[in-house]
Amino acid sequence: LDVWAHSVAALSHVPPEPTIRIAALLHDIGKPSCFTVDENRIGHCYGHAQIGAEIAEEILLRLKSDRATQTAVCDLIRFHDRLIEPNERSVRRALQLRGSAFFFDLMRLKRADNLAQAPEFRSRQTDYDVIEQMAHGILERADCLSLSDLAVNGDDLKGIGIPSGRTMGAVLRHLLEQVTDDHLPNEKNALLTYAASLPPDFAPPKTHE
């Protein structure tokens, strides 16, 4: 299928809700402007999701769409190609992007995108079932997904000598990542012991997710 036919097919697989239907129609609009062919004559559209989000924003601005719709549509397009694997770490990371409502809209778009491909490429639907089941379990358990869910806060960190400001913010975000990835339990003593072991000028390593 070409981009237009694929987009129309994806549109037929999403619910009749304006935000997700606009996102489905425009989700691959960035592909033509970033299409390249490699030495094996295989086509690629690297970066099309980000470019598509920027183009969609321009379109929605011209149409005088409200800001909430612009943000939701552009975020769905921006993240529609993000790999979400059927494991809890990956699902928690996806839930942290924009919250649970956005996550399930994103899954609807990803399902539609996959169903709009040729039959031999529609194999991800089973993975999506597992991913959504995991997400419901994570939400029902009230897993730690945000800084406010952490068992420690800024006052706790001050109590072990971590200064306010950039360092404290970096430590809190790092603790959240450690809990998200199951490297630490979300328990006050465990988090404070780990935080106390970090260097005074702690800065987390850069990630490329």
Regions found by a protein language model. Give the residues of each.
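Divalent metal-dependent catalytic cores for phosphoryl transfer on phosphate-bearing substrates
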Residues: 2-125
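Charged substrate- and nucleic-acid-binding regions of tRNA-handling and nucleotidyl-transfer enzymes
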Residues: 58-62, 115-209
